[in-house]
Amino acid sequence: MNINNTLKLTLCGILAVSVLNSCSKKSDEAEIQPVKEEIGMTQVTIKTSVGEINLELDGDKAPITVKNFVDIANSGYFEGTIFHRVINGFMIQGGGLNADMSNKSSGTAPIQNEANNGLSNDRGTIAMARTMDPHSATSQFFINHKDNSFLNHTGENQQGWGYAVFGKVTDGMDIVDAIADVATGSAGGHQDVPLDVITIESVTVAE
């Protein structure tokens, strides 16, 4: 295996393990939500402590995921959570930890993985983070900092399900780049944590 492939597999493993730690307390929550309801395109603004990121969520391709994200956003849950995992040239991840690195439960059931919707993990897309269980995503998400095709759906099995893309950045990639470029270290049992806390101040869904 060449160095590039080894790095990709390592980064994918880091993502899965980090989310496993933050979502491990959700096993006793309700069963997976299977109902689909197409909701069209939704505009969302993530206001962070370093700037705003505007996104368009594709409710036609990922209706379950978009509804879940919008419902959580409208509840105010994301306020005060952080981008806790940042890897330059890979992705920035947030939506599940507090500033003190403690887990924050959204109280929502895990959702069906919609990674087989034809959307790819390209630079600037937003996707759901999860555990090794393909259908375990709740609130944590990541924004791809580059094209990460190895995260795409390749088959309906544990190894091939991939990570469900449900939208893309329409404005604010400079903020994503700035977050990806921050210095990181270890904190609270996690790696690749920004040394200066990057807070999600709000996630606003357009009317």
Describe the residue ranges of each PLM region.
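Cyclophilin-like peptidyl-prolyl cis-trans isomerases
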Residues: 4-8, 23-207
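Residue-level detector of alpha-helix boundary/anchor positions
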Residues: 15-17, 159
